[in-house]
Amino acid sequence: MMDGKVIISIGRQFGSGGRSIGKMIAEKLGIGYYDVELLRLAAKEIGFGEEAFAAVDEKPNFGRFFQNIENLMSGSQTDSLMSNANLFQVQSDVIRQIAERESCVIMGRCSDYVLREDDRCVSLFLTADEDDRVRRVMERLEVDEVKAEKIITSTNKRRAEYYNYYTGKKWGDAASYHLCVNVTALGEEGTADFICDFVKRKFRL
């Protein structure tokens, strides 16, 4: 466990290995790891059960979230709660609560922007060479190369639109983050080690 609180916000291109790297960083530093759990915690805050998130993956795409929970709700509450802005605000509040409570790695969800005024937050963006990203997606989802390329393109498009809309910044632009890393250069574990060293040096841990 590290001395002093640190929050590591990680944005990533789909297929870059970001989830695995985020988990490695959390394990190496002995801190918490939050990904899709943020959505579940946000759901509880506004009275939804975890079953509402059964079909929601790591992509911050509330459009599908609406589809999944629409059948679970009825009455006038639906109109007031079922808005992107409301859900983004609730999720942002959950992110702030977690950051206040503990050191952790937070994957995506505009957490770098939500915590932009927290001087203990370091923001990262992970990319990888295209062939590496395609390979990972083919292996993970058991799809062919053409399908993998389509999934990568559509997922990154959604992530960029979501991030750009809520932050007013540009997703993946180096100016939006403290550090951008191409995972292909060092591999997943090498990248995790590099980031851990960067964090320790930045905060003099």
Segments from the language model and where they lie:
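Small-molecule kinase domains that catalyze NTP-dependent phosphoryl transfer to phosphate-bearing small molecules
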Residues: 63-68, 144-189
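Pre-Walker A (Motif I) flank of P-loop NTPase domains
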Residues: 3-12, 102
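ATP-dependent small-molecule kinase phosphotransfer cores
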Residues: 43-103
